[in-house]
Protein backbone atom coordinates (compact mmCIF):
# COMPACT_ATOMS: atom_id res chain seq x y z
CA UNK A 1 0.00 0.00 0.00
CA UNK A 2 1.23 3.56 -0.76
CA UNK A 3 3.01 5.26 2.09
CA UNK A 4 2.98 8.92 3.03
CA UNK A 5 6.17 10.74 2.02
CA UNK A 6 5.30 14.36 2.79
CA UNK A 7 2.68 16.47 4.53
CA UNK A 8 2.39 20.20 3.84
CA UNK A 9 -0.05 22.84 5.06
CA UNK A 10 -0.90 26.41 4.19
CA UNK A 11 -3.18 29.23 5.25
CA UNK A 12 -6.01 29.85 2.74
CA UNK A 13 -9.39 31.62 2.88
CA UNK A 14 -12.86 30.24 3.56
CA UNK A 15 -16.17 31.52 2.20
CA UNK A 16 -16.31 34.31 4.79
CA UNK A 17 -12.87 35.57 3.79
CA UNK A 18 -11.34 34.24 6.99
CA UNK A 19 -8.23 32.06 7.21
CA UNK A 20 -8.48 28.30 7.32
CA UNK A 21 -6.11 25.36 6.90
CA UNK A 22 -5.39 23.50 3.68
CA UNK A 23 -3.30 20.32 3.81
CA UNK A 24 -1.54 18.39 1.05
CA UNK A 25 -0.47 14.79 1.57
CA UNK A 26 1.87 13.21 -0.98
CA UNK A 27 2.32 9.45 -1.31
CA UNK A 28 5.32 7.50 -2.54
CA UNK A 29 3.65 6.86 -5.90
CA UNK A 30 3.38 10.62 -6.50
CA UNK A 31 -0.30 10.87 -5.65
CA UNK A 32 -1.33 14.06 -3.84
CA UNK A 33 -4.46 14.48 -1.73
CA UNK A 34 -5.60 17.95 -0.76
CA UNK A 35 -8.26 19.04 1.76
CA UNK A 36 -9.55 22.32 3.20
CA UNK A 37 -11.10 22.72 6.64
CA UNK A 38 -14.48 24.46 7.19
CA UNK A 39 -15.44 26.68 10.13
CA UNK A 40 -18.74 27.33 11.93
CA UNK A 41 -20.42 30.54 13.16
CA UNK A 42 -22.86 29.11 15.70
CA UNK A 43 -20.65 26.51 17.36
CA UNK A 44 -21.54 23.97 20.01
CA UNK A 45 -19.80 24.23 23.38
CA UNK A 46 -18.46 20.69 23.07
CA UNK A 47 -16.98 20.99 19.58
CA UNK A 48 -13.34 20.19 18.99
CA UNK A 49 -11.25 23.36 19.20
CA UNK A 50 -10.29 25.33 16.13
CA UNK A 51 -6.82 26.77 16.76
CA UNK A 52 -6.44 30.47 15.90
CA UNK A 53 -3.34 32.64 16.29
CA UNK A 54 -4.85 35.46 18.34
CA UNK A 55 -2.34 38.02 17.05
CA UNK A 56 -2.67 41.12 14.85
CA UNK A 57 -2.99 39.25 11.57
CA UNK A 58 -6.52 38.76 10.21
CA UNK A 59 -8.00 40.18 13.40
CA UNK A 60 -6.52 37.34 15.41
CA UNK A 61 -8.05 34.66 13.21
CA UNK A 62 -4.91 33.52 11.40
CA UNK A 63 -4.05 29.81 11.45
CA UNK A 64 -0.25 29.85 11.21
CA UNK A 65 0.02 27.94 14.49
CA UNK A 66 -2.16 25.17 13.11
CA UNK A 67 -0.11 25.11 9.91
CA UNK A 68 3.10 24.79 11.92
CA UNK A 69 1.58 21.99 13.99
CA UNK A 70 0.83 20.07 10.80
CA UNK A 71 4.32 20.45 9.37
CA UNK A 72 6.44 20.30 12.51
CA UNK A 73 4.55 17.92 14.82
CA UNK A 74 2.09 15.79 12.83
CA UNK A 75 4.08 15.27 9.62
CA UNK A 76 7.13 13.58 11.23
CA UNK A 77 4.83 11.12 13.02
CA UNK A 78 2.76 10.00 10.03
CA UNK A 79 5.28 10.14 7.19
CA UNK A 80 6.07 6.56 6.29
CA UNK A 81 2.66 5.26 7.34
CA UNK A 82 0.28 3.40 5.03
CA UNK A 83 -2.16 5.99 3.69
CA UNK A 84 -5.01 3.47 3.65
CA UNK A 85 -4.70 2.89 7.40
CA UNK A 86 -7.04 5.80 8.18
CA UNK A 87 -7.99 4.75 11.74
CA UNK A 88 -4.33 4.27 12.70
CA UNK A 89 -3.34 7.65 11.29
CA UNK A 90 -6.22 9.42 13.01
CA UNK A 91 -5.46 7.64 16.28
CA UNK A 92 -1.83 8.72 16.03
CA UNK A 93 -2.88 12.36 15.71
CA UNK A 94 -5.37 12.09 18.58
CA UNK A 95 -2.65 10.67 20.83
CA UNK A 96 -0.18 13.31 19.67
CA UNK A 97 -2.65 16.00 20.67
CA UNK A 98 -3.47 14.45 24.02
CA UNK A 99 -6.54 16.57 24.83
CA UNK A 100 -10.26 15.78 24.73
CA UNK A 101 -11.09 18.66 22.40
CA UNK A 102 -7.92 18.62 20.28
CA UNK A 103 -6.91 22.00 21.67
CA UNK A 104 -3.16 21.31 21.66
CA UNK A 105 -2.63 20.80 17.94
CA UNK A 106 -5.99 22.20 16.84
CA UNK A 107 -8.89 20.32 15.30
CA UNK A 108 -8.36 22.34 12.13
CA UNK A 109 -4.81 20.99 11.84
CA UNK A 110 -5.77 17.39 12.60
CA UNK A 111 -8.85 17.35 10.37
CA UNK A 112 -7.01 18.81 7.40
CA UNK A 113 -4.53 15.96 7.55
CA UNK A 114 -7.23 13.35 8.14
CA UNK A 115 -9.26 14.36 5.09
CA UNK A 116 -6.22 14.85 2.84
CA UNK A 117 -4.95 11.36 3.72
CA UNK A 118 -8.28 9.82 2.72
CA UNK A 119 -8.36 11.68 -0.57
CA UNK A 120 -4.75 10.72 -1.36
CA UNK A 121 -5.45 7.06 -0.61
CA UNK A 122 -8.52 7.01 -2.86
CA UNK A 123 -6.61 8.65 -5.72
CA UNK A 124 -3.72 6.23 -5.31
CA UNK A 125 -6.10 3.27 -5.55
CA UNK A 126 -7.77 4.81 -8.60
CA UNK A 127 -11.28 4.84 -7.14
CA UNK A 128 -13.69 7.68 -6.33
CA UNK A 129 -13.59 9.00 -2.79
CA UNK A 130 -17.17 7.92 -2.06
CA UNK A 131 -16.32 4.37 -3.14
CA UNK A 132 -13.13 4.33 -1.07
CA UNK A 133 -15.00 5.48 2.04
CA UNK A 134 -18.23 3.55 1.54
CA UNK A 135 -17.27 0.41 -0.33
CA UNK A 136 -18.92 -1.18 -3.38
CA UNK A 137 -22.47 -0.70 -2.09
CA UNK A 138 -22.24 3.11 -1.78
CA UNK A 139 -24.84 4.39 -4.23
CA UNK A 140 -27.46 6.46 -2.37
CA UNK A 141 -27.60 10.14 -3.32
CA UNK A 142 -28.84 12.41 -0.53
CA UNK A 143 -31.90 14.63 -0.33
CA UNK A 144 -30.63 18.23 -0.21
CA UNK A 145 -31.74 20.41 2.69
CA UNK A 146 -31.36 23.90 1.22
CA UNK A 147 -31.08 26.85 3.59
CA UNK A 148 -32.79 29.44 1.43
CA UNK A 149 -33.80 31.97 4.11
CA UNK A 150 -31.02 32.74 6.56
CA UNK A 151 -31.45 34.10 10.07
CA UNK A 152 -29.73 33.94 13.44
CA UNK A 153 -25.94 33.95 13.36
CA UNK A 154 -25.93 33.53 9.57
CA UNK A 155 -27.62 36.81 8.65
CA UNK A 156 -28.09 40.40 9.72
CA UNK A 157 -31.88 40.34 10.05
CA UNK A 158 -34.30 39.86 12.96
CA UNK A 159 -35.11 36.18 12.39
CA UNK A 160 -34.08 34.21 15.47
CA UNK A 161 -34.41 30.79 13.85
CA UNK A 162 -31.16 30.32 11.98
CA UNK A 163 -32.19 28.35 8.91
CA UNK A 164 -35.40 27.99 6.92
CA UNK A 165 -34.92 25.19 4.42
CA UNK A 166 -36.65 23.66 1.43
CA UNK A 167 -36.36 19.88 1.08
CA UNK A 168 -36.94 18.58 -2.48
CA UNK A 169 -37.50 14.90 -1.74
CA UNK A 170 -40.36 13.70 -3.95
CA UNK A 171 -38.28 13.05 -7.05
CA UNK A 172 -36.71 10.08 -8.81
CA UNK A 173 -33.15 11.38 -8.85
CA UNK A 174 -30.83 13.83 -7.18
CA UNK A 175 -30.53 15.89 -10.36
CA UNK A 176 -34.32 16.29 -10.55
CA UNK A 177 -34.51 17.23 -6.88
CA UNK A 178 -31.71 19.75 -7.28
CA UNK A 179 -33.42 21.36 -10.26
CA UNK A 180 -36.66 21.70 -8.30
CA UNK A 181 -34.79 23.27 -5.39
CA UNK A 182 -32.95 25.72 -7.65
CA UNK A 183 -36.13 26.75 -9.45
CA UNK A 184 -37.89 27.32 -6.13
CA UNK A 185 -34.91 29.32 -4.84
CA UNK A 186 -35.06 31.72 -7.79
CA UNK A 187 -38.84 32.12 -7.55
CA UNK A 188 -38.37 32.85 -3.86
CA UNK A 189 -35.94 35.63 -4.73
CA UNK A 190 -38.49 37.20 -7.06
CA UNK A 191 -41.22 37.05 -4.41
CA UNK A 192 -38.98 38.58 -1.77
CA UNK A 193 -37.93 41.41 -4.06
CA UNK A 194 -41.56 42.17 -4.90
CA UNK A 195 -42.51 42.29 -1.22
CA UNK A 196 -39.48 43.93 0.39
CA UNK A 197 -37.44 45.45 -2.42
CA UNK A 198 -33.95 44.57 -3.72
CA UNK A 199 -32.46 44.52 -0.21
CA UNK A 200 -34.36 41.30 0.51
CA UNK A 201 -32.27 39.35 -1.99
CA UNK A 202 -29.02 40.01 -0.18
CA UNK A 203 -27.66 36.65 0.88
CA UNK A 204 -26.28 35.34 4.16
CA UNK A 205 -23.28 33.13 4.89
CA UNK A 206 -24.84 30.04 3.32
CA UNK A 207 -26.19 31.62 0.15
CA UNK A 208 -29.76 31.97 1.39
CA UNK A 209 -31.67 35.22 1.28
CA UNK A 210 -31.72 37.42 4.38
CA UNK A 211 -34.97 39.41 4.12
CA UNK A 212 -36.11 41.89 6.79
CA UNK A 213 -38.61 39.50 8.37
CA UNK A 214 -39.52 39.50 12.05
CA UNK A 215 -41.71 36.53 13.00
CA UNK A 216 -41.75 32.74 12.77
CA UNK A 217 -44.42 32.28 10.13
CA UNK A 218 -43.43 34.96 7.62
CA UNK A 219 -40.57 32.93 6.09
CA UNK A 220 -42.60 29.72 6.10
CA UNK A 221 -45.52 31.38 4.31
CA UNK A 222 -43.32 32.71 1.53
CA UNK A 223 -41.53 29.36 1.17
CA UNK A 224 -44.83 27.57 0.60
CA UNK A 225 -45.81 30.27 -1.91
CA UNK A 226 -42.48 29.91 -3.74
CA UNK A 227 -42.84 26.14 -3.96
CA UNK A 228 -46.31 26.51 -5.49
CA UNK A 229 -45.24 29.33 -7.84
CA UNK A 230 -42.37 27.13 -9.06
CA UNK A 231 -44.92 24.45 -9.98
CA UNK A 232 -44.32 21.96 -7.19
CA UNK A 233 -46.48 20.47 -4.44
CA UNK A 234 -45.64 21.63 -0.90
CA UNK A 235 -45.07 18.61 1.31
CA UNK A 236 -45.47 15.96 -1.36
CA UNK A 237 -42.59 17.10 -3.56
CA UNK A 238 -40.84 19.84 -1.60
CA UNK A 239 -41.10 19.96 2.19
CA UNK A 240 -39.77 22.46 4.74
CA UNK A 241 -37.20 22.15 7.53
CA UNK A 242 -35.92 24.41 10.31
CA UNK A 243 -32.68 24.85 12.19
CA UNK A 244 -33.65 26.84 15.27
CA UNK A 245 -30.11 26.85 16.75
CA UNK A 246 -31.90 27.47 20.04
CA UNK A 247 -28.73 27.68 22.12
CA UNK A 248 -28.13 31.04 20.43
CA UNK A 249 -31.29 32.59 21.94
CA UNK A 250 -31.32 30.72 25.25
CA UNK A 251 -30.92 32.87 28.36
CA UNK A 252 -29.00 30.89 30.97
CA UNK A 253 -29.79 33.27 33.82
CA UNK A 254 -33.55 32.84 33.51
CA UNK A 255 -33.58 29.40 31.89
CA UNK A 256 -35.84 30.71 29.14
CA UNK A 257 -35.70 31.30 25.42
CA UNK A 258 -35.90 34.87 24.08
CA UNK A 259 -37.05 34.79 20.49
CA UNK A 260 -39.07 37.06 18.23
CA UNK A 261 -39.60 39.58 21.01
CA UNK A 262 -41.04 37.08 23.46
CA UNK A 263 -39.88 34.89 26.32
CA UNK A 264 -40.60 31.15 26.27
CA UNK A 265 -40.16 28.31 28.73
CA UNK A 266 -39.03 25.00 27.31
CA UNK A 267 -42.60 23.66 27.18
CA UNK A 268 -43.90 26.85 25.60
CA UNK A 269 -41.25 26.68 22.88
CA UNK A 270 -42.11 23.03 22.23
CA UNK A 271 -45.73 24.15 21.78
CA UNK A 272 -44.54 26.70 19.20
CA UNK A 273 -42.88 23.91 17.21
CA UNK A 274 -45.98 21.73 17.49
CA UNK A 275 -48.12 24.55 16.11
CA UNK A 276 -45.72 25.13 13.21
CA UNK A 277 -45.64 21.42 12.35
CA UNK A 278 -49.45 21.32 12.33
CA UNK A 279 -49.66 24.30 9.96
CA UNK A 280 -46.76 23.75 7.55
CA UNK A 281 -45.20 20.77 5.70
CA UNK A 282 -42.21 20.66 8.06
CA UNK A 283 -40.29 17.38 8.13
CA UNK A 284 -37.23 18.23 10.22
CA UNK A 285 -36.32 20.54 13.12
CA UNK A 286 -32.69 20.92 14.13
CA UNK A 287 -31.53 22.05 17.58
CA UNK A 288 -35.01 23.05 18.79
CA UNK A 289 -33.71 23.42 22.37
CA UNK A 290 -30.54 24.30 24.28
CA UNK A 291 -27.52 22.06 23.71
CA UNK A 292 -27.43 20.88 27.35
CA UNK A 293 -31.11 19.95 27.55
CA UNK A 294 -31.08 16.21 26.84
CA UNK A 295 -34.31 15.78 28.81
CA UNK A 296 -35.97 18.51 26.78
CA UNK A 297 -34.84 16.85 23.55
CA UNK A 298 -36.30 13.56 24.82
CA UNK A 299 -39.59 15.35 25.53
CA UNK A 300 -39.90 16.98 22.13
CA UNK A 301 -38.86 13.73 20.44
CA UNK A 302 -41.60 11.89 22.33
CA UNK A 303 -44.18 14.51 21.35
CA UNK A 304 -43.13 15.23 17.76
CA UNK A 305 -40.69 12.49 16.76
CA UNK A 306 -43.32 10.40 15.00
CA UNK A 307 -44.14 13.36 12.74
CA UNK A 308 -40.81 15.08 12.10
CA UNK A 309 -37.11 14.50 12.38
CA UNK A 310 -35.60 16.01 15.54
CA UNK A 311 -31.95 16.66 14.71
CA UNK A 312 -29.15 17.05 17.24
CA UNK A 313 -26.35 19.36 16.10
CA UNK A 314 -25.02 21.34 19.07
CA UNK A 315 -26.55 18.60 21.24
CA UNK A 316 -24.29 15.87 19.82
CA UNK A 317 -21.45 17.80 18.07
CA UNK A 318 -20.74 14.62 16.04
CA UNK A 319 -19.31 13.12 19.23
CA UNK A 320 -19.98 9.37 19.64
CA UNK A 321 -20.04 9.67 23.45
CA UNK A 322 -22.67 12.43 23.47
CA UNK A 323 -24.61 10.56 20.81
CA UNK A 324 -24.67 7.41 22.97
CA UNK A 325 -26.10 9.46 25.83
CA UNK A 326 -28.79 10.81 23.52
CA UNK A 327 -29.66 7.35 22.24
CA UNK A 328 -30.01 6.03 25.80
CA UNK A 329 -32.31 8.92 26.74
CA UNK A 330 -34.32 8.99 23.50
CA UNK A 331 -33.10 12.53 22.85
CA UNK A 332 -33.59 13.45 19.17
CA UNK A 333 -33.93 10.91 16.40
CA UNK A 334 -31.27 12.18 14.01
CA UNK A 335 -27.65 13.31 14.01
CA UNK A 336 -26.24 16.28 12.15
CA UNK A 337 -22.77 15.13 11.11
CA UNK A 338 -20.06 17.79 10.77
CA UNK A 339 -16.54 16.45 10.43
CA UNK A 340 -14.90 19.51 11.98
CA UNK A 341 -16.97 19.24 15.16
CA UNK A 342 -15.08 16.09 16.16
CA UNK A 343 -11.85 16.64 14.21
CA UNK A 344 -11.08 13.35 12.44
CA UNK A 345 -12.74 11.42 9.65
CA UNK A 346 -12.61 8.19 11.66
CA UNK A 347 -14.54 9.64 14.60
CA UNK A 348 -17.09 11.33 12.33
CA UNK A 349 -17.78 8.08 10.48
CA UNK A 350 -18.05 6.25 13.81
CA UNK A 351 -20.71 8.72 14.95
CA UNK A 352 -22.63 8.39 11.68
CA UNK A 353 -22.58 4.61 11.72
CA UNK A 354 -23.59 4.53 15.40
CA UNK A 355 -26.60 6.73 14.66
CA UNK A 356 -27.70 4.63 11.71
CA UNK A 357 -27.32 1.40 13.68
CA UNK A 358 -29.77 2.74 16.28
CA UNK A 359 -32.36 3.89 13.78
CA UNK A 360 -31.40 7.55 13.89
CA UNK A 361 -31.35 9.60 10.73
CA UNK A 362 -28.04 11.15 9.67
CA UNK A 363 -27.64 14.43 7.82
CA UNK A 364 -24.13 15.25 6.62
CA UNK A 365 -23.54 18.99 6.89
CA UNK A 366 -21.32 21.83 5.75
CA UNK A 367 -20.38 24.82 7.94
CA UNK A 368 -21.29 28.46 7.46
CA UNK A 369 -17.63 29.27 6.81
CA UNK A 370 -16.99 26.60 4.20
CA UNK A 371 -14.71 26.19 1.19
CA UNK A 372 -14.81 24.90 -2.36
CA UNK A 373 -13.76 21.45 -1.09
CA UNK A 374 -16.66 19.02 -1.80
CA UNK A 375 -15.48 16.25 0.57
CA UNK A 376 -18.82 16.01 2.39
CA UNK A 377 -20.64 15.18 -0.86
CA UNK A 378 -18.62 11.99 -1.16
CA UNK A 379 -19.03 11.33 2.56
CA UNK A 380 -22.84 11.53 2.35
CA UNK A 381 -22.89 8.97 -0.45
CA UNK A 382 -20.37 6.78 1.36
CA UNK A 383 -22.52 6.66 4.49
CA UNK A 384 -25.68 6.10 2.46
CA UNK A 385 -27.53 8.34 4.90
CA UNK A 386 -29.65 10.00 2.24
CA UNK A 387 -29.51 13.55 3.63
CA UNK A 388 -27.15 16.48 3.13
CA UNK A 389 -27.26 20.10 4.25
CA UNK A 390 -24.97 22.33 2.28
CA UNK A 391 -26.71 25.67 1.90
CA UNK A 392 -28.63 27.41 -0.83
CA UNK A 393 -27.79 26.76 -4.49
CA UNK A 394 -25.61 29.89 -4.54
CA UNK A 395 -21.96 30.73 -3.73
CA UNK A 396 -19.33 28.34 -5.04
CA UNK A 397 -18.59 26.98 -1.56
CA UNK A 398 -22.16 25.56 -1.61
CA UNK A 399 -22.60 24.70 -5.28
CA UNK A 400 -19.31 22.79 -5.26
CA UNK A 401 -21.01 20.11 -3.16
CA UNK A 402 -24.10 20.00 -5.38
CA UNK A 403 -21.97 19.78 -8.51
CA UNK A 404 -19.94 16.96 -7.01
CA UNK A 405 -23.14 15.05 -6.25
CA UNK A 406 -24.27 15.51 -9.85
CA UNK A 407 -20.99 13.97 -11.01
CA UNK A 408 -21.34 11.08 -8.56
CA UNK A 409 -24.88 10.38 -9.79
CA UNK A 410 -23.60 10.37 -13.37
CA UNK A 411 -20.74 8.07 -12.36
CA UNK A 412 -23.15 5.61 -10.74
CA UNK A 413 -25.49 5.76 -13.75
CA UNK A 414 -28.35 3.27 -13.40
CA UNK A 415 -27.09 2.01 -10.04
CA UNK A 416 -27.74 5.34 -8.31
CA UNK A 417 -30.47 5.53 -5.68
CA UNK A 418 -32.02 8.68 -4.26
CA UNK A 419 -33.70 9.47 -0.98
CA UNK A 420 -33.27 9.30 2.78
CA UNK A 421 -32.24 6.06 4.41
CA UNK A 422 -34.81 6.63 7.16
CA UNK A 423 -37.88 8.00 5.42
CA UNK A 424 -40.40 7.89 8.27
CA UNK A 425 -40.45 11.67 8.50
CA UNK A 426 -41.30 12.37 4.88
CA UNK A 427 -44.96 12.86 3.95
Swiss-Prot record:
GO MF terms, alphabetically ordered: magnesium ion binding; phosphopyruvate hydratase activity
PROSITE patterns, sorted: ENOLASE
GO terms for biological process, alphabetical: glycolytic process
SMART domains cross-referenced by the UniProt entry: Enolase_C (SM01192), Enolase_N (SM01193)
Binding site for Mg(2+): 243, 286, 313
GO CC annotations, alphabetized: cell surface; extracellular region; phosphopyruvate hydratase complex
Residues at the catalytic site: 206, 338
Residues reported to bind (2R)-2-phosphoglycerate: 162, 338, 367-368, 389
Keyword Cytoplasm (UniProt): yes
Gene3D superfamilies: Enolase-like C-terminal domain, Enolase-like, N-terminal domain
Catalytic activity field: (2R)-2-phosphoglycerate = phosphoenolpyruvate + H2O
Main subcellular localisation: cytoplasm
Alphabetic keyword roster: Cytoplasm, Glycolysis, Lyase, Magnesium, Metal-binding, Secreted
EC number: 4.2.1.11
Origin: domain of life: Archaea
Listed pathway(s): Carbohydrate degradation; glycolysis; pyruvate from D-glyceraldehyde 3-phosphate: step 4/5
Cofactor note: Binds a second Mg(2+) ion via substrate during catalysis.
Cofactor: Mg(2+)
Location relative to the cell: Cytoplasm; Secreted; Cell surface
One of the Pfam families matching this protein, by short name: Enolase_C
HAMAP family for this protein: Enolase
PANTHER family the record matches: ENOLASE (PTHR11902:SF1)
Task of the protein: Catalyzes the reversible conversion of 2-phosphoglycerate (2-PG) into phosphoenolpyruvate (PEP). It is essential for the degradation of carbohydrates via glycolysis.
Entry's family note: Belongs to the enolase family.
Name listed for the protein in its UniProt record: Enolase
Organism per entry: Methanopyrus kandleri (strain AV19 / DSM 6324 / JCM 9639 / NBRC 100938)
Taxon lineage: Archaea, Methanobacteriati, Methanobacteriota, Methanomada group, Methanopyri
Protein's gene: eno
